[in-house]
């Protein structure tokens, strides 16, 4: 049985105390970009979510260089996803013996990097020209207007 060479590595950050929506705002900007471009984007973005994501990108690149021996120039973020984690629930004491709940949301972030020098399909896919779909004619003919019944009101 032939064993395929592994071309992807990942880094997983769990229970990061941040809203999943706020982390997705940053993750959507870096998905599909190269490693160097990702580092530059994350260092210049003004969001609090950038630092944990930057640490995960560094970790995924370190995993790629250690496990596969790949160079950082060949790495591309192939998949990046954010899932909601557990919610830490606490009670804050308030006046007159009442208490208000405090919900602290967490998230799980997964960064998957692909080495494009090891992946043969990536070179073939980028060299192929994207085909354009032909637009079908949407103009209605005389015969279609009366047969479909969509032209006239039925009052």
From Swiss-Prot:
Biological source species: Solanum lycopersicum
Record keywords: Chloroplast, Plastid, Ribonucleoprotein, Ribosomal protein, RNA-binding, rRNA-binding
Protein purpose: This protein binds specifically to 23S rRNA.
Family of the protein in this entry: Belongs to the universal ribosomal protein uL22 family.
Quaternary context: Part of the 50S ribosomal subunit.
Protein name: Large ribosomal subunit protein uL22c
Any GO BP annotation: translation
Record SUPFAM superfamilies: Ribosomal protein L22
Superkingdom in the source lineage: Eukaryota
Keyword Metal-binding: no
GO MF terms, alphabetically ordered: rRNA binding; structural constituent of ribosome
Disulphides: none
Alphabetical list of PANTHER family matching this protein: CHLOROPLAST 50S RIBOSOMAL PROTEIN L22-RELATED (PTHR13501), LARGE RIBOSOMAL SUBUNIT PROTEIN UL22M (PTHR13501:SF10)
Primary location class: plastid
